[in-house]
């Protein structure tokens, strides 16, 4: 396993209700659909961009 690849732990802390449709789709793309659901993803540029778009709904931790 390559130890040079960083991962981030993302937890949804706020609801997507009342948010724009593209923000809801971004959460689904990250694998999040319920409050307090956590996913661990590779820290790539595409993931960073998605996280930046909905960062107000998430808690982000580096691993």
Swiss-Prot record:
Keywords from the named record: Ribonucleoprotein, Ribosomal protein
GO molecular function, one term: structural constituent of ribosome
A family per Pfam: Ribosomal_L30
Subunit field text: Part of the 50S ribosomal subunit.
Organism: Rickettsia canadensis (strain McKiel)
Lineage per the UniProt record: Bacteria, Pseudomonadati, Pseudomonadota, Alphaproteobacteria, Rickettsiales
Signal peptide: none
Protein name (Swiss-Prot/TrEMBL): Large ribosomal subunit protein uL30
Protein family (similarity comment): Belongs to the universal ribosomal protein uL30 family.
GO biological process, one term: translation
Gene Ontology cellular-component terms listed: cytosolic large ribosomal subunit
Gene3D superfamilies given in the database record: Ribosomal protein L30, ferredoxin-like fold domain
HAMAP family: Ribosomal_uL30_B
């Amino acid at each position: 396993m390559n130890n040079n690849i960083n991962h981030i732990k993302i937890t949804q802390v706020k609801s997507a209700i009342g948010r724009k449709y593209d923000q809801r789709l971004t959460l689904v793309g990250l694998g999040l659909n319920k409050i307090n659901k956590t996913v661990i993803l590779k820290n790539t540029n595409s993931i960073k961009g998605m996280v930046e778009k909905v960062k107000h709904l998430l808690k982000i931790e580096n691993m």
